[in-house]
Amino acid sequence: MSTRVDAWIWAIRLTKTRSAAGAACRGGHVRVNGATAKPAQPVVPGDEVRVRLNGRERVVEVTKTISKRVSAPMAAECYI
């Protein structure tokens, strides 16, 4: 099952708001498997997602797709 990349990075708590996640995608700060991602691009388990925010780059691998925001311990189970 796939999830929109903006919803996924918000759900796993890499951004504080869904609109901030969409803005990061539109600004070219999110890459999926090396390619710049638009907010609606789907992610599936096994994809590599790079998010550049506040001068830091987070590189995570999708292990589980979710679209609802969950607690931090549950969110940590969705990526490596």
Which residues make up each language-model segment?
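Short, charged beta-turn/beta-strand-edge "cap" motif at the junction between a beta-strand
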Residues: N54-R58
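Glycine-rich, charged/polar anion/phosphate-binding loops
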Residues: E48
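A basic, amphipathic helix-loop patch mediating RNA/tRNA/ribosome contacts
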Residues: M1-P45
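Short, solvent-exposed secondary-structure boundary/capping segments
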Residues: K68-C78
